[in-house]
Amino acid sequence: MSQAHRHLALLLPAEAVLCAAAMRFQDVLSNGRTAPVTNHKKIQGWSSDQNKWNEKLYPFWEDNDPRWKDCWKGGKVTTKLVTDSPALVGSNVTFVVTLQFPKCQKEDDDGNIIYQRNCTPDSPAAQDQYVYNWTEWIDNCGWENCTSNHSHNVFPDGKPFPHYPGWRRRNFVYLFHTVGQYYQTIGRSSANFSVNTANITLGKHIMAVSIYRRGHSTYVPIARASTTYVVTDKIPILVSMSQKHDRNISDSIFIKDSPITFDVKIHDPSYYLNDSAISYKWNFGDGSGLFVESGATTSHTFSLQGNFTLNLTVQAIIPVPCKPVTPTPSLPTPAVTTDASSNSDPSAPNEMAEDNPDGGCHIYRYGYYTAGITIVEGILEVNIIQMTSIQMTESQAENPLVDFVVTCQGSFPTDVCTAVSDPTCQVSQGMVCDPVVVTDECVLTIRRAFDEPGTYCINITLGDDTSQALASALISVNGGSSSGTTKGVFIFLGLLAVFGAIGAFVLYKRYKQYKPIERSAGQAENQEGLSAYVSNFKAFFFPKSTERNPLLKSKPGIV
């Protein structure tokens, strides 16, 4: 009897050692990280990482294990794990993992890994040569007895693979791990999934993934990756600011007396807030008061220079299922509708908002944004008030020259840029920028040379360190040399002389037969008729310009 007790005493410690040595999901998926002992709420569809791991079918290798070098033919497989975090508690956070194969390798439509055609000169000679032909393995039943033995189509915890259509073409096993739980799935060269954050505590967490590929007798580890994600009870928001004449949108410096547009973007990739009532409360910090908007875009004009701090509070009233009416030991606290202190427990506002919803069928969530901006005097407007062509002598340059007289309102510019493009203002033909010094009045004369006569679209931009403004015009440029102008004048005078002679002859023939010798009154009448005819003649050959503004956009001004 004593001998039996001795055998039993030896067996019990041995069994305890075996149990202690059994590998668990936490040992494999934590990758050496020691997670704090915390009781996490169960995530729907996930399992505890204290479950046993089948190390025989899914071997575990340390980071420095030499077997990693031979886990994949032709090189090393890397993986990229990304997330759309941060996530508002209660919404879904999505993760996407993508495998990146060695050069010249890709996945085909059947889930096999093949060499790309004509990838490099030293690539394998045979076209579409397989790196891993898993379809052939399955068809030949080379991996166990595929008609009766399904022991290999299981996850590390022993659960069978889901047999949905096309499952045999998914030759990678993805194992995700976070907050003491794991999720397992099969897939191809990429996989994505979403997790509801209702039962995940607020704060930063790590999502880790381990990927195995199908092998002949076991699954082979090929890559690991991890990323950080955030669960918060504050609505994630981003505010973009823009202004018409602002030169640099990223420096938070804007112009006085010019509207600033504020556009609010709520980060809600899972559309958790789609059915919520959202409002935006603005305080621009300039003493103008509070503004409540129902839309995500608003504008505000600062009439004073200086530094200002703007504050935005976004409120979302989220409908939730009504909870059963149960007596509560305490009344709701007003802290739900006030700003949470930075020293408070981050999980407290979440619990209060969920346990004490207004009316029992919705909860409040808030998002906050604060930014400092600087308002300065800027260039508000630029006008082209005059364009003059410059006549050149034959010894000077033949390129036509035009002087532009421009004025501006606001601050004085420090640089001027002149851009020339085709008549449609679409194809640029060049731009010239020069520094300028304006001390008294914003009136500048800008001389611009053109390659040849023609019609051009001209843009003149005046700018300083913080702002810029633009004026445009469509102009028609004539030849610039004086010889060309002189030739044009002579031709015009010659034509004028010819037409004058013809006109004199016509007048002589017409009025000769009506000219009485002795009637002075009739003479005066004929003189009036002659004057009217000469006026008509002058109007025909010398029409007055009806264009008062040479910068009209409808037609080019001739300079």
Curated annotation (Swiss-Prot):
One BP annotation, GO: cell adhesion
Extracellular compartment segments: 23-487
Protein's UniProt keywords contain Glycoprotein: yes
Residues of the signal peptide: 1-22
InterPro entries: Ig-like_fold, PKAT, PKAT_KLD, PKD/Chitinase_dom, PKD_dom, PKD_dom_sf
SUPFAM superfamilies named in the record: PKD domain
Keyword check for rRNA processing: no
A Pfam family matched in the record: PKAT_KLD
An annotated Gene Ontology molecular function: integrin binding
Subcellular location: Membrane
Record-level GO cellular component terms: plasma membrane
Membrane topology: Single-pass type I membrane protein
Entry-listed glycosylation sites: 92, 133, 145, 149, 192, 199, 248, 274, 307, 311, 459
PKD domain boundaries: 239-326
Chief subcellular location: membrane
Keywords: Glycoprotein, Membrane, Signal, Transmembrane, Transmembrane helix
Polar residues: compositionally biased ranges: 335-347
Disulfide bonds: none
Physiological role: Could be involved in melanogenesis.
Similarity annotation: Belongs to the PMEL/NMB family.
PANTHER family in the cross-refs: MELANOCYTE PROTEIN PMEL 17-RELATED, TRANSMEMBRANE GLYCOPROTEIN NMB
Protein name from the UniProt record: Protein QNR-71
Organism: Coturnix japonica (Japanese quail)
